[in-house]
Amino acid sequence: MKKALLFSLISMVGFSPASQATQVLNGYWGYQEFLDEFPEQRNLTNALSEAVRAQPVPLSKPTQRPIKISVVYPGQQVSDYWVRNIASFEKRLYKLNINYQLNQVFTRPNADIKQQSLSLMEALKSKSDYLIFTLDTTRHRKFVEHVLDSTNTKLILQNITTPVREWDKHQPFLYVGFDHAEGSRELATEFGKFFPKHTYYSVLYFSEGYISDVRGDTFIHQVNRDNNFELQSAYYTKATKQSGYDAAKASLAKHPDVDFIYACSTDVALGAVDALAELGREDIMINGWGGGSAELDAIQKGDLDITVMRMNDDTGIAMAEAIKWDLEDKPVPTVYSGDFEIVTKADSPERIEALKKRAFRYSDN
């Protein structure tokens, strides 16, 4: 096992994950905190949520030219979230009668910073009306600040629902996603119901950055505080299935007596599932995160025990509706989060099928 692949975050007595978790959103507004602080934003977010759930109402006045939209996404993953997101986005744009031109680049998460940078600069040179991107690393943040400060391109930040406090005077056009903290709290509540106090567990993070902080540390904070669970180890991964497999094996070699592993993403979880099967450790409970097609298949096979399922197409639809409102000169909320549902391997095929129809109502058709 190549230790260079992994960074063991926790390996010493006295580490306090709960104290670290209080800093999870340092520098960010929590989703509900932001809406509480700015009631007019809550009203706009609620109105957008209603539009997402409703049938599309076409644009009142067609645009003179196609609007230019550029998308740079970390799409090369087992998780189908990003691909479905674009599919639902385009289908809703079509139903809203919005004339558009889309340029999209899918990259590997965490690995292709150079490619992302080139694609982003190309999007700016082409004078895109809207740029859809994500925010996970410091390098991403520097680029976002460049866009906010020096271009007319309107920025949609995907997969983040916690506005950056430093940008309060000039926020992006829209933060859109499924609130990582809320999804992680829902999983923490379910694990808390299932296991007794002082249960041993391990965590497999995503790559270093925002997603690991919010999905991982939010969970750690809640189960340690509410259930007195005892964290034995935590590893950053490379956000891939292989690194999830490697991290799970490394973790269990040092701490074999855990009752569950908390995984922060689909790819990491499915890699850990392979490791557990190879080691004959099906007694260890493992979760998914996101509830895409690969996770739901694993749940129905009994390989995964539980996941928090995003109503996936909500965010693609929300982006299309926000652009429509902007073209109609209507105010657009700063932030939008889609809905979650908890799914377990005990759920009936009928319930899972109903949730799939709701979550993938555009991207499956």
From Swiss-Prot:
CDD domains: PBP1_LuxPQ_Quorum_Sensing. InterPro entries: Peripla_BP_I (IPR028082), SBP_2_dom (IPR025997). Pfam families: Peripla_BP_4 (PF13407). It is found in: Periplasm. Residues 1-23 form the signal peptide. Its main location: periplasm. GO terms for molecular function: DNA-binding transcription factor activity; transcription cis-regulatory region binding. GO terms for cellular component: periplasmic space. Disulfide bonds: none annotated. Belongs to the bacterial solute-binding protein 2 family. Binds to the signaling molecule autoinducer 2 (AI-2), a furanosyl borate diester, (3a-methyl-5,6-dihydrofuro-[2,3d][1,3,2]dioxaborole-2,2,6,6a-tetraol). This complex then interacts with the LuxQ sensor protein. This is Autoinducer 2-binding periplasmic protein LuxP.
